[in-house]
A protein has these predicted regions:
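Catalytic-core regions of core metabolic enzymes
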Residues: 1-186
Length: 186
């Protein structure tokens, strides 16, 4: 289960109270949770999905999520336009349709307000009631910021990766719509 198992463990560690539905074609359980054999087997379309499969399979997963009404996805895999893979990122954008995606080549989003981590590691962060949202193209930058001990409460950490669908302005605007966000760091 790899990276996806890490995401499940981080949500559990942060006390996320919402449903978490791992999907794996052969495993019955991941991280102590029932695993579903396919997206079609889920109880309903997920609000948000961390996609931890290779770049070629990511396109198919995004298409299936979009068709079932998924709320959005983090596309973790690398090897898209940043590595010269011609046309694959355009296929991903077409597969997403109207569904927002962060990435590809994206580490994800951490929501310390609600304990929802679509991110493989939280790097020592803690739950907060309000705080700053940090946004970067590069996961490395916000990871390094998140590993620092600061007096500044961090509400969100988010990466854009290749920003194939959701761009900086759209993500920043969505984070600022949360009244618990006190400032935005880019």
């Amino acid at each position: 289960a790899g990276w996806a198992l890490n995401v499940i463990e981080q949500c559990q560690k942060m006390g996320f109270k919402g449903p978490v539905w791992p999907v794996h074609p052969t495993r019955a359980e991941i991280g102590g949770l029932k695993a579903y054999a396919s997206l079609a087997d889920l109880p309903e379309a997920p609000d948000a999905t961390f996609i931890g499969v290779n770049r070629f399979a990511t396109v198919d997963v995004v298409a299936e999520l979009a068709a079932m009404g998924g709320g959005g996805a983090i596309c973790f895999a690398s090897g898209w336009e940043e590595s010269g893979e011609a046309g694959l990122q355009e296929r991903l954008v077409a597969a997403a349709g109207d569904m927002p995606i962060l990435g590809p080549n994206c580490y994800g989003v951490i929501n310390y307000l609600d304990g929802a981590l679509l991110w493989p590691d939280q790097h020592g962060g803690i739950r907060v009631k309000n705080g700053v949202a940090l946004v970067s193209q590069s996961s490395n930058i916000v990871i390094n910021m998140g590993m620092q001990q600061r007096g500044l409460p961090v509400a969100y950490m988010a990466c854009l990766g290749n920003a194939a669908v959701v761009g900086l302005a759209e993500l920043a605007g969505a984070l600022l719509d949360d009244p618990r966000v006190t400032a935005l760091g880019l």
